[in-house]
Regions:
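Active-site regions of oxyanion-processing enzymes, predominantly non-cytosolic
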Residues: 42
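Generic start-of-chain signal for non-secretory N-termini
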Residues: 1-23
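Soluble acyl-CoA-dependent acyltransferase catalytic core bearing the H(X)4D motif
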Residues: 1-8, 27-38, 46-427, 431-462, ...
Length: 493
């Protein structure tokens, strides 16, 4: 029997709309001088995909929906799989600089994927000679994945399957030994409908089990919070990022040297790279909203995804993820105190999850029938018009560590790697923390109507890092934003 989407996978499928395409992504810049003859043909990249694609089963599967969404769809092999549809070749418009590349990536990322095909697509992008700091002749590779098929770690597994730790050159010509896709293991309609009834009963039994454990679970949470002095996460204040999103996106990415990150961690014992990244985003949001005269008195709230994926799950696709909803202390004036507060909050929140387990809300997601999820997805699509409340967080901060050694695509050496998130109505800013070689990267995707000036937020991120670095080394600093004025949160309409 074909594998079925999980409830979490289905959530991302049902909420995919023109304004909220549920796609995450990566892009890298590559130096072809290490490839055979110092040049990479597009067909070399196609050949690389062709010889590696079977390592990632999710890359050649598509969804088969159950009539009327009575149950979650099934994954079936795409017998008409067309690699040249999924891997495309384009050129960056002149002047071919970093700004143009970010604009192009934002536009490509804003387009929904075709849900009738395997849920990913990539672009090889030439014409990057106007980008400072990279060798001439470089090309970029951008790839996006639907979150129903790949979470952040599964997407990273796909990306790594295409790469090597040394220059490896594709052998043979693209299409020379093209495999015939195996016959799709398609379930019949009667079988799917029958299973939908069985699955519904299982979900109701699971819901009853979770309900029976609700009071003990809540008691454990209260006991843990009281023991560790951890306050209940407050409601988020409303900001410009917590309104309906348009289909338009802006994107940018910044790099920071690992050497400076290590100095900060050495100066503040116990601080993790994730703590530092959350603090940088906190400080940057504080600065950005202050310039708009919209900085709330209350701390902003962030959703930080937590991967539950095990080593044996590599290449399997799908979603195995939970999340923490935490204050990021944007109401603290001093950057060093912000870092310490973030470290304290993240440490206790992670400890609570390990000791108490996932929240009731996370557990209940697995009990919601597909018909209800599908209806909720349609409701989310019209939510901007009917004034539905936004989600529980102001922004998302996702940490997906990357390789510390050189990686090669079709023999070309990667010189940069960056991640790209997704937006939802009510959460119009997504920050991704990643790493490659000797750099830590913070990239962000935002709704263009909510952030018409991404260069201002980009500058705020860089200034935030510099302030934290200076503060941790000197132990003191005079922040440029000294006070928080009366809260000017965005009003709900």
């Amino acid at each position: 029997m074909a594998q079925q989407l999980t409830n979490m996978d289905g959530t991302f499928l049902y909420t995919d709309t023109r304004n909220t395409p549920e796609t995450i992504g990566n892009f890298g810049i590559y130096d072809p001088s290490t490839a055979r003859d110092g040049f990479v043909r597009f067909k070399d990249i196609l050949r690389t995909f062709e010889t590696r694609i079977d390592v990632v089963p999710a890359a050649s599967r598509k969804i088969m929906r159950v009539p009327m969404d009575l149950d979650h769809p099934y994954w079936v092999e795409d017998t008409g799989f067309d690699l040249e549809y999924h891997v495309r070749h384009i050129a960056l418009p002149k002047p071919g600089d970093w700004r143009q590349l970010c604009i192009l990536i934002a536009r490509l990322h804003s387009h929904p994927l075709d849900l009738d095909r395997p849920l990913w697509q990539s672009y090889v992008i030439e014409g990057l000679d106007g980008i400072d700091g990279v060798p001439k002749g470089c090309f970029a590779h951008y790839i996006k994945y639907h979150h129903a098929a790949f979470d952040g770690m599964a997407a990273n597994d796909f990306l790594m399957a295409l790469h090597d730790g040394s220059p490896v050159f594709p052998e043979g010509e693209f299409g020379s030994d093209r495999k015939k896709r195996r016959t799709a293991d398609k379930p019949g309609v009667p079988e799917m409908v029958a299973r939908s009834y069985t699955n519904f009963l299982k979900q109701q039994l699971n819901m009853a089990k979770i309900g029976a454990g609700a009071l003990p679970q809540l008691a454990k949470e209260r006991k843990f919070r009281k023991k560790h002095g951890l306050e209940k996460t407050p409601s988020k204040p409303d900001t410009r990022f917590n309104t309906p999103v348009s289909p338009n996106r802006v994107y940018a990415a910044l790099e920071f040297p690992f050497s400076k990150v290590k100095e900060i961690r050495a100066a503040v014992p116990g601080v993790t790279i994730n703590d530092l990244a959350v603090t940088i985003v906190s400080r940057a949001l504080r600065k950005y909203l202050h310039t708009k005269k919209e900085l709330p008195e209350e701390s902003l709230i962030a959703l930080t995804p937590v991967s539950l994926r095990k080593q044996e799950d590599a290449g399997g696709g799908g979603n195995s993820v939970s999340g923490l909803i935490v204050p990021i202390h944007t109401n603290i004036e001093d950057p060093l105190e912000t870092l310490k507060a973030v470290n304290n909050t993240m440490t206790k929140s992670k400890a609570q999850r390990l000791e108490v387990g996932d929240s009731m809300l996370v557990k209940l997601v697995d009990t919601i029938p597909s018909l209800v999820q599908s209806g909720f997805g349609k409701l989310m699509d019209i939510s901007p018009r009917i004034g539905m409340p936004a989600g529980p967080a102001n922004t998302v901060i996702s940490n997906v560590p990357g390789p510390r050694a050189h990686m090669y695509l079709a023999g070309a050496k990667a010189v940069k790697f960056h991640g790209i998130g997704i937006l939802q109505h009510g959460i119009g800013l997504f920050n991704v923390v990643s790493s490659y070689l000797d750099n830590v990267t913070i990239s962000f995707l935002a709704c263009r109507e909510q952030m018409p000036d991404p260069d201002v937020y980009e500058a705020a991120i860089r200034e935030a890092f510099d302030e934290i670095y200076e503060a941790t080394l000197k132990g003191e600093i005079t922040p440029k934003v000294k006070t928080v004025t009366k809260a000017k949160s965005k009003k709900k309409k």
